[in-house]
């Protein structure tokens, strides 16, 4: 049964749209935990477009569940992670031009740089995950550089037409099986919604799903605590015959 990590970046997006003091991500993280979140995920981007450094520090000091920091593979971000000490760091690709993360990290051609970062994080007892596309070579490279976890990018599945979703789902299933056979832990996320999450949640071996935008959107109608509760129900009790 997968657990649920709630990404609260979009709470900060609303605040930063007016450079205001509300909504407060820390308060919303508390409500997410009340709704059943097993962890809180934030992406501290280099351009600080939503989550700010102070948010990360306050979350580390206040949340009762796990803190997962998504970050680019840069010296600045590694230094911040070593100071804040989140429970997990997920290394993601990052481009200032993108609206959101557009794909998995290129591990194969950046193994030495990533290996050094992972070693530094592990020395501080910070678990490290690599956000990758469901591609065999990227999984193998993630294992080779010492990552303990991978997070499978589900964006292609989420954006696929109904006819092609099953093909993308099969890729994710195969990648999960491959990663587990190598001794890697597996998370998944990106683009998942209340309508498409169950087939992913039903995949054997996926330990956590990180979901944000759809929960924040649903919260406008039912409140954040209820929105998280609804998603938690789908993640922990998925129907297994969606396809």
Swiss-Prot record:
Pathway(s) annotated for this protein in UniProt: Cofactor biosynthesis; pyridoxine 5'-phosphate biosynthesis; pyridoxine 5'-phosphate from D-erythrose 4-phosphate: step 5/5
Pfam families registered for this protein in UniProt: PdxJ
Site (Transition state stabilizer): 151
Active site: 43, 70, 190
UniProt: 3-amino-2-oxopropyl phosphate binding residues: 7, 18, 191, 212-213
GO cellular component, one term: cytosol
Catalytic activity: 3-amino-2-oxopropyl phosphate + 1-deoxy-D-xylulose 5-phosphate = pyridoxine 5'-phosphate + phosphate + 2 H2O + H(+)
Protein's cellular compartments: Cytoplasm
EC nos: 2.6.99.2
UniProt cross-references to InterPro entries, sorted A to Z: Aldolase_TIM, PyrdxlP_synth_PdxJ, Pyridoxine-5'_phos_synth
A GO molecular function held by the record: pyridoxine 5'-phosphate synthase activity
Residues annotated to bind 1-deoxy-D-xylulose 5-phosphate: 9-10, 45, 50, 100
GO biological process entries: pyridoxine biosynthetic process
Keyword annotations from UniProtKB, A to Z: Cytoplasm, Pyridoxine biosynthesis, Transferase
Keyword field contains Cytoplasm: yes
Secretion signal, residue range per the UniProt entry: none
Subunit structure and binding partners: Homooctamer; tetramer of dimers.
Function comment: Catalyzes the complicated ring closure reaction between the two acyclic compounds 1-deoxy-D-xylulose-5-phosphate (DXP) and 3-amino-2-oxopropyl phosphate (1-amino-acetone-3-phosphate or AAP) to form pyridoxine 5'-phosphate (PNP) and inorganic phosphate.
PANTHER family per UniProt: PYRIDOXINE 5'-PHOSPHATE SYNTHASE
Family of this protein: Belongs to the PNP synthase family.
The protein's name: Pyridoxine 5'-phosphate synthase
Native organism: Prochlorococcus marinus (strain MIT 9211)
Lineage: Bacteria, Bacillati, Cyanobacteriota, Cyanophyceae, Synechococcales
